[in-house]
Amino acid sequence: MKISSLFNSGKTVFSFEVFPPKKTSPIESVYGRLEEISALKPDFISVTYSAGGSGSKSRTCEIATKIKRDFGVESVAHLTCINSTKADIDRNLALFKENGIENILALRGDRVEGVEPQKDFTYASDLCRYIASQGDFDIAGACYPEVHSEATDEVEDIHNLRKKVESGASHLISQLFFDNSVYYRFLERAKIAGVNVPIEAGIMPVTSKSQIERMVSMCGASLPAKFAKIMQKYDTRPEALRDAGIAYAVDQIVDLIAHGVDGIHLYTMNNPYVARKITEAVSSLL
């Protein structure tokens, strides 16, 4: 099934992200958690290209295939290009086709310190265009409510986003954010710029102090005062912090659905408990 067709149903699309285990762990180590997460029956599950920079291309396809064939949920395979040649991309696309994976989230990927990027693909839009020329894949792209860290300003960022859509992305999934007003302003900028494809809001339930620090460092998401106060109050009580993080994410999602967003993409961090609590809280609203 092509993921883009979900946005024609009139309901709020609700999807998850999961990731493969590190190379040092057997791939089967995540199957139990992924089965629990899949049992919540999201509209689709996306599988990241790697886990903390140490994952495997083939593991992404293997897990995406497992989710689709064995757990009965449509899957989306992430694919990055900055450190890949066309031959690398061709191998991945062939693997996806062979295993019935129809949906790809096309990403540039992170620059690796000390590693010279390959020359075949400079931007995610280059990858979108290439995938579109290579077969009948449904292509998703990423977007950044608080502006991509390498963009000079909002204008350049939206220009790059529009280019990604023009290159073949049929829908978009946003980077995480904690302030819904930031997301609504982003949607308005995208609309004015003529970005008229469905956009899913990326929600990250923060469940530990270390996760907050890591996520802010990685993506530069701003922390609204309400969020910061919650985290400060419970930062020495792990279970309370987890539950407060879940509650904050639920509040975000309820507000987003009320504002008529196209979809919610939940970054589950492979945590069935968190995914279940949030799904139970919002499923009647979708």
Walk through the language-model features, giving the residues of each.
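Glycine-rich, proline-tolerant flexible connector loops at the mouths of alpha/beta enzymes
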Residues: 21, 43-63, 110-119, 170-183, ...
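Glycine-rich, positively charged N-terminal anion/phosphate-binding segment
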Residues: 3-4, 27-36, 52-73
